[in-house]
Amino acid sequence: YRQEKADKGLISLDGKPLEHWTLKETAKQMAVVTQFNQLQFDCTVEEIVLLGRTPHLSFLQKEKERDYALVQDALVKVDMLEKKTRLYSSLSGGEKQRVLLARALAQEPTLLLLDEPTNHLDIKYQLDLLAIVKELKVNVLAVLHDIQLACRYSDYLYLMKEGEILYQGTPKETITPESLQTVYGVQSQVTWTEDQQAMIHYL
């Protein structure tokens, strides 16, 4: 999300090199949810999500009815509408991540980037958050270190080591004893349940 430039090669968005996009244009197309973070100022849940409309507003332009409607829709999707007047700082870790996801959705992105969004969350909140993401009608590119969660909620996986993609494909194609040995240096047995969840046993 434009924090660093590529050492080599070209990164494109919709066929256009990323450096040719302005920051505002990029923010209209791409939204980001990072690892758990604590904002340093107090805002309500609704105010936080409304920040997602910033790329669509000109300088000093006030939000319109449509902006508030999109915020409400985003809060409904993450099941946080009833808490829209709560202070962000008063929420649990899982609730905060859902609010940040709602803010990203309010941007109306075509691509949603998730950088370890479940880090520091209890397992229930991890499952809740990824289940919400799975149901969204938007392209999602996520960084996850939990292999079994990645298999459960992903359609396509890239398995990387030291910045290089070594394996890619469907979860079943990608997560094998051979790939886990190569990438992580561990021996394992991988079995799959009827609903295509990976069961990994490390030897």
Model segments located where?
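Helix-to-loop junction immediately C-terminal to a conserved catalytic motif
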Residues: 1
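Conserved ABC transporter NBD signature motif
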Residues: 9-17, 26, 86
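Conserved ABC ATPase "signature" region
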Residues: 50, 65-83
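Conserved ABC ATPase signature
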Residues: 87-91, 95
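A short, proline-enriched helix->beta-strand linker immediately N-terminal to the Walker B motif
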Residues: 106-110
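Catalytic Walker B motif of ABC-type/P-loop ATPase nucleotide-binding domains
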Residues: 112-116, 121
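ABC ATPase nucleotide-binding domains
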Residues: 177-178, 182-203
